[in-house]
């Protein structure tokens, strides 16, 4: 275990089940037992995580074997959650923060283990392979095949066990969502991902709030009123 700082907060790095793990602690004066997990891209666009540390949340991260929502990664997050409960007294449920492919990971985790989730923050989430604006990029095809065991590129589009197919578990369990996305996203199609999620949640009268950035491309993530986002999280997490 090594100790350092993360934007002024105490950070520990350690190994959990052979994976890189991180836990960042809030200041003692406003520390709570609440916590959030960043599902992918730990150091990218950290504005929300830093702001929530300021509200007393812990920040956790566990390295994935891949970015594509395989069951081994979701199960490792469940085990990691139980470890953080036992070792540090954190709550059973966490805020799950997923940006881009991290949104895929977040929905995969939440759909398999909904009782470990208090709320999902999804920022330009990718929920299916057909939701990519360039699904036939060679590097992506090879990454997808390796992660999920596909023999061909076309297999990706007939797989019916992707995050987009698991939204029913989220709404059945009334898991709240804070959704942020840009209308000019050229990486993750907003209609086939964020808006499909929004339509599903509306159809099932499930709790969701949207921050829409009409001129925003895939990046930057966040770039919205963080106080509004954090207030929504505080008022709606279960």
Q: Locations of the language-model features?
A:
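Hydrolase active-site cap/lid region
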Residues: 108-154
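The feature captures the conserved acid-bearing segment of alpha/beta-hydrolase catalytic domains
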Residues: 134-138, 142-202
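C-terminal catalytic histidine-bearing segment of alpha/beta-hydrolase fold enzymes
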Residues: 24, 191-238
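N-terminal cap/lid segment of alpha/beta-hydrolase-fold proteins
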Residues: 1-31
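Short beta-strand element of the alpha/beta-hydrolase
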Residues: 31-41
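Alpha/beta-hydrolase fold nucleophile elbow
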Residues: 88-100
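Glycine-rich nucleophile elbow surrounding the catalytic serine of serine-hydrolase chemistry
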Residues: 98-108
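Alpha/beta-hydrolase active-site loop
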Residues: 68-89, 108
């Amino acid at each position: 275990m090594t100790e350092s700082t993360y934007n002024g907060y105490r950070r520990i790095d350690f190994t959990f089940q052979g994976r890189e793990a991180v836990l960042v602690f809030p200041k003692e004066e406003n520390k709570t037992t609440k916590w959030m997990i960043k599902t992918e891209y730990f150091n990218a666009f950290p504005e929300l995580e830093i702001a929530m540390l300021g509200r007393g949340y812990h920040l956790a991260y566990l390295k994935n074997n891949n970015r594509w929502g395989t069951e081994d990664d979701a199960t490792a997050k469940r085990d990691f959650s139980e470890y953080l409960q036992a070792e540090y007294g954190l709550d059973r449920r966490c805020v799950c923060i997923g940006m881009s492919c991290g949104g895929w990971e977040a929905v995969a985790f939440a759909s398999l283990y909904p009782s470990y989730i208090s709320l999902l923050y999804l920022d330009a989430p990718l929920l299916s392979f057909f939701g990519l604006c360039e699904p036939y990029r060679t590097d992506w095809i090879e990454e997808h095949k390796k992660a999920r065991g596909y023999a061909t590129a076309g297999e990706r589009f007939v797989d019916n066990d992707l995050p987009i197919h698991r939204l029913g578990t989220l709404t059945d369990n009334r898991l709240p969502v804070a959704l942020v996305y840009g209308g000019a996203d050229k990486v993750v199609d907003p209609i086939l991902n964020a808006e499909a999620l929004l339509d599903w949640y509306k159809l099932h009268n499930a709790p969701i709030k949207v921050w829409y950035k009409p001129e925003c491309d895939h990046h930057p993530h966040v770039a919205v009123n963080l106080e509004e986002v954090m207030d929504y999280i505080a008022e709606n997490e279960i």
